[in-house]
């Protein structure tokens, strides 16, 4: 049976409508048939909760994309309609923005259609806290004050390459809590698939990212132990100090995501850059928190506050998530593992070029001299040379890179 993504229209094309909220609380909308019109909050909820009965497919105005955020509602709508028409023809209907709308929903629907994945088990409350605490972000640092020639490299579609790997596994079932003694943990030569509550004694943040909640995946701990020879100290308190998965609860990235990644990467490789956003969006979409925006009189005990935003009327908007249904999708168990696979991948490159690398950000690095000990290329997952430039590193997050003629 085909899985239908919530908020999409599975059998009928809709009118793509771009909207943005105005200061009066109403929503200004635009589509190519009705042009500009305005709806209130109740109408918006009615339209968006019943996408199969309304003629419209609503998409929030994009304020993040560098190109799109400079456009008006009309310009964004025209741009998306052009892309929708192109993709519909290019993919023979496999990607139909007139039915799915947003990048996230389109990627998710294509994943279900191409891969027909197994149904993951419900994520239990005891898993959520550990999954979140183990989900350290990307490797980001810079050699402050560096001002010289830089050579830029990055991995080709790093996260999709991890998802397409037969070497990397992901959980699709419930993890089992375990409490190790220090003796038991010390006797483990190799840590099996799971999450561990430990203290890692790190002396070089270029090659290892510390987690301040002290929860790590087996991947980064095995790397810290075998490659870096770091001391790993088990934490013992009143709670379990590991969440482990049996082999029967795991699936390889290739088996789970392979058809999705292969299909889109082939199109991207042929120059159809319109599909890049879907290729990169899937894993984040699967890990999305099921958030609600509310102006409450009180926060229920089954809700966790994620953020608080003040309103002009003196009230506050709370972003919350249910503690018993924290994620939108039960594939969200992949979150800490895909992040750690990505970190360890680039940290291995840094380790082999420790005297050259002056900046790292997620899947890209800048070096003071060319890399010669790693095979470069443009295939999925390979390290690719991006160019040479005058580089100034201001801090971990900010740098200046002005490309110059390349003699490599």
List PLM regions with ranges.
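Conserved acidic
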Residues: 1-408
């Amino acid at each position: 049976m085909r899985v239908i993504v919530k908020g999409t229209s599975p059998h009928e094309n809709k009118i793509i409508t771009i909207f943005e909220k105005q200061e009066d609380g109403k929503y200004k909308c635009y589509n190519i048939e009705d042009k500009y019109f305005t709806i209130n909050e109740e109408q918006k909820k009615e339209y968006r909760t019943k996408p199969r009965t309304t003629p419209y497919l609503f998409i929030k105005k994009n304020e993040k994309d560098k190109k799109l955020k400079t456009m008006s509602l009309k310009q964004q709508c025209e741009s998306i309609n052009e892309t929708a028409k192109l993709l519909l023809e290019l993919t023979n209907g496999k990607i139909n923005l007139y039915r799915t709308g947003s990048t996230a929903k389109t990627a998710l629907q294509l994943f279900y259609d191409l891969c027909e994945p197994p149904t993951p088990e419900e994520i239990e409350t005891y898993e959520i806290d550990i999954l979140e605490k183990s989900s350290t972000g990307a490797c980001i640092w810079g050699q402050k004050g560096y001002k010289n020639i830089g050579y830029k490299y990055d991995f080709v579609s790093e996260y999709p390459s991890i998802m397409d790997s037969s070497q990397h596994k992901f959980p699709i079932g419930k993890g089992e809590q375990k409490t190790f003694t220090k003796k038991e943990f010390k006797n483990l030569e190799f840590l099996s698939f799971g999450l561990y509550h430990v203290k890692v004694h790190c002396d070089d943040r270029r090659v290892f990212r510390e987690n301040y909640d002290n929860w790590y995946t087996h991947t980064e701990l095995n790397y810290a132990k075998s490659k870096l020879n770091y001391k790993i100290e088990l934490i013992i308190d009143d709670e379990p100090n590991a969440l482990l998965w049996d082999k029967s609860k795991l699936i390889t990235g290739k088996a789970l995501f392979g058809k999705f990644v292969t299909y889109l990467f082939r199109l991207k490789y042929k120059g159809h850059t319109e599909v890049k956003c879907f290729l990169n969006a899937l894993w984040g979409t699967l890990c999305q928190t099921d958030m609600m925006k509310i102006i409450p009189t009180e926060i229920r005990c089954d809700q966790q506050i994620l953020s608080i935003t003040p309103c002009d009327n003196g009230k506050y908007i709370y972003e919350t998530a249910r503690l018993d249904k924290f994620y939108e999708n039960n594939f969200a168990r992949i979150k800490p593992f895909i992040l750690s696979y990505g970190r360890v991948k680039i940290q291995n490159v840094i380790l082999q070029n420790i005297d050259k690398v002056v900046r790292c950000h997620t899947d890209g690095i800048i070096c003071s001299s060319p890399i010669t000990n790693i095979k470069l290329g443009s295939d999925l997952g390979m390290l690719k040379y991006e160019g040479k430039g005058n580089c100034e590193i201001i801090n971990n997050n900010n740098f200046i890179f002005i490309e110059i003629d390349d003699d490599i």
